[in-house]
């Protein structure tokens, strides 16, 4: 039920399927981030990532993520590799702690990820990150994202929409 609702709410065609590298590989940018710990995604927060590239390896058993985080006003590049867990659609990656993430929706020009981060101190953060090859979500997608975020325990006030692209690595 939740998967069906998610497909409808974010407006992305979702199905448990093998990811196709031709659909994933290439340039993407962050258009929305939501988290239950809003300080983690605020300006200068360690989980406020500005995505630039996704790449599948080994038939998408591994996903490479290239993103930038602005720390102390400076852009820092991160190249992170997520390894798919056996018998699961969940990937595990190390960045600002341990991350368990999965694709919860995708279509040609947008991908939504759900991420569960446990930082080095043990603090847990639930997140939704939407990356795209377009500049924004539609109003309907924004409204539905708020509903899904609420179901994941993320207050709608903690959703950040990126109206413009980041200035890192231009």
Curated annotation (Swiss-Prot):
The keyword Secreted applies. It holds the Pfam family Lipocalin. It is found in: Secreted. SUPFAM superfamilies: Lipocalins. Keywords: Allergen, Disulfide bond, Secreted, Signal. GO terms for cellular component: extracellular space. One of its GO terms (molecular function) is odorant binding. Its main location: secreted. Residues 1-15 form the signal peptide. Not N-linked glycosylated. InterPro entries: Calycin (IPR012674), Lipocalin (IPR002345), Lipocalin_CS (IPR022272), Lipocln_cytosolic_FA-bd_dom (IPR000566), OBP-like (IPR002448). PROSITE patterns: LIPOCALIN. Expressed in submaxillary gland (at protein level). The keyword Chaperone does not apply. Disulfide bonds join 56-60, 75-168. Belongs to the calycin superfamily. Lipocalin family. This is Lipocalin Cav p 3.0101. It comes from Cavia porcellus (Guinea pig). The gene is Lcncavp3.
